[in-house]
Amino acid sequence: MQFSEELLTLKDQVRFDKSFKVGKYDKIVIAGMGGSGIAGRIFSEIYDEKPVFLVDDYDIPSFVDDKTEFIAISYSGNTEETISASEEAAKKHANVHAITSGGSLSKMGFDTIIIPSGLQPRSSIGYLLMPLVNTFIKPKIGDVDEAYRLLSETDKDNEEEKSIASEIYNGEHIPVIYGSRPFRAIAYRWKTQFNENAKVLAYSNYFSELNHNDTMPLKDTYRKDEFYFLVFRSDDSRFSKRITVTEKITGNSFRMVDVRGSSLLAKLFYLIHFGDYLTYHLAELRGVDPQDVSLIEKLKKEIA
Amino acid sequence: MQFSEELLTLKDQVRFDKSFKVGKYDKIVIAGMGGSGIAGRIFSEIYDEKPVFLVDDYDIPSFVDDKTEFIAISYSGNTEETISASEEAAKKHANVHAITSGGSLSKMGFDTIIIPSGLQPRSSIGYLLMPLVNTFIKPKIGDVDEAYRLLSETDKDNEEEKSIASEIYNGEHIPVIYGSRPFRAIAYRWKTQFNENAKVLAYSNYFSELNHNDTMPLKDTYRKDEFYFLVFRSDDSRFSKRITVTEKITGNSFRMVDVRGSSLLAKLFYLIHFGDYLTYHLAELRGVDPQDVSLIEKLKKEIA
């Protein structure tokens, strides 16, 4: 499947309706790396009924116990950090679940949701995220439908994404993405998509934390014109004010990205898909294969 | 006080022996922004007996309740996000504590540790961090003494820091700092010190997560030579192997930073201080005032 075809599957992924049965628990721990880990990051920002703790490492925290819902996410099912963390969680009698398309993780005896294989992990974000949303948030059908519609529209018209990609390409810019709650993790998702799809270094940060550090160099850093600041528009007046004032006092003109949609679910997926197309177009302009992650595979082999 | 004099106070700060009395709790929530927020970030990486949740925003998660130890950290005591979060926590009957040098936060009736005023918040990291360490970890006297000794040595000899600063200055490089557990937060601390002290944009990331995204562009990104990769050496073989292999397959030569010390506390403070001097020297070379954060102050006024 071509990468552009992978992108067309996202709209259907939001209709993926599997969920876990969970018992009594007082905290959730989600383990996952890279493209699989993003699902946990996004979920942890939109759910706060119980503490959600993310593990993107080999080891799990001491507090994991039999009151912990532990969810291991690995698209391939063979991510060594996630396998290691899951084994530790099982030893501590956590209630371990898994989301994977196969691999070792699917054979460890955990309560597992199997998702379709054949995609890049980062192109399966709907399959990876929706089981979390279905289990703990239970979205309205209308919200899922709205997300489906917005994703379909983005598939048909992504001229704005293409135009931003051109600007970045022409200036050989270093993309920096600024989000704000509840889209901090999406800003990070864009950073990783720039990395993996377009093979350019990119960074993300978020309001208002960045007003306590990035703000100083935004005015007087060297190489300032080499950066390209993409900022998600916020309908929270506390953040929108900070964005406007930051632009003004640092003498920058941010490229604002409108967040379309009315439900949170639709907004999240709309923004995700915007970043998918933006980085896909940049890959095309650069003449690099957006699917190619051979270096990451090579690294996995060398350290195994 | 000159910035260089502020740096000389750090060794004494690690001997700051105040702590909170805590009752029964099942989770810890720490609120703080920027230079004050770093203390929570560092603490959350070295303590895992109970879940630690960080708040760097106006609002607190729904799960905050009367079993929550809530610690508000604001050097000035006037950080609007932290004040807002603390008020919300008090309403939810969390056990609220504060660490501050004064301001509104000191007058809100919380159980408060007052720390010396007159420093930049980022230069008071010892005062901000040690109450957390003293309360929940209880360091050995020998570890505190080791940290004191290493910091004193760094105060007397920071030639290596100066030499790295020169390289970065001469190439007008964009610093990127790669850490690994338990020093991920220190990598972020360095990023913020580059921002606030030297007024240059800088970024941080950590192993092994970065092997799932940054690794691709590390080989073929445009502008590759403009970056300067600082990597903390790790004595965890899983990370040290990843560092070596990443360098090799991406064709980069990282500037490795040795982590001196034997106790974790000493290592943490040694690395913090290394970054302090490195960014201070870069500020000097650039001819900018490391103490100047007038833009951040201006922003605070404009949004108030």
UniProtKB/Swiss-Prot annotation, chains A, B:
* Isomerase recorded as keyword: yes
Q: Name one GO molecular function term.
A: mannose-6-phosphate isomerase activity
> Per the UniProt entry, what are the Gene Ontology biological process annotations, in alphabetical order?
carbohydrate derivative metabolic process; carbohydrate metabolic process
What positions does the entry give for D-fructose 6-phosphate binding?
A: 35-36, 74, 76, 79, 122, 212, 300
EC number of the protein: 5.3.1.8, 5.3.1.9
What are the protein's UniProt keywords? Carbohydrate metabolism, Isomerase
Reaction(s) catalyzed by this protein?
alpha-D-glucose 6-phosphate = beta-D-fructose 6-phosphate; D-mannose 6-phosphate = D-fructose 6-phosphate
Q: Which residues form the active site?
A: 196, 212, 300
Keyword Hydrolase present in the record's keywords: the answer is: no
User: Which Gene3D superfamilies does the record cross-reference, listed alphabetically?
Assistant: Glucose-6-phosphate isomerase like protein, domain 1
Checking PROSITE patterns in the record gives: SIS
Q: Where is the SIS domain?
A: 16-147
The record's annotation in InterPro entries points to: Glu6P/Mann6P_isomerase_C (IPR019490), SIS_dom (IPR001347), SIS_dom_sf (IPR046348), SIS_PGI/PMI_1 (IPR035484)
Coiled-coil zones: none
Which family, according to the similarity comment? Belongs to the PGI/PMI family.
So what does this one do? Dual specificity isomerase that catalyzes the isomerization of both glucose-6-phosphate and mannose-6-phosphate to fructose-6-phosphate.
Protein name from the UniProt record: Bifunctional phosphoglucose/phosphomannose isomerase
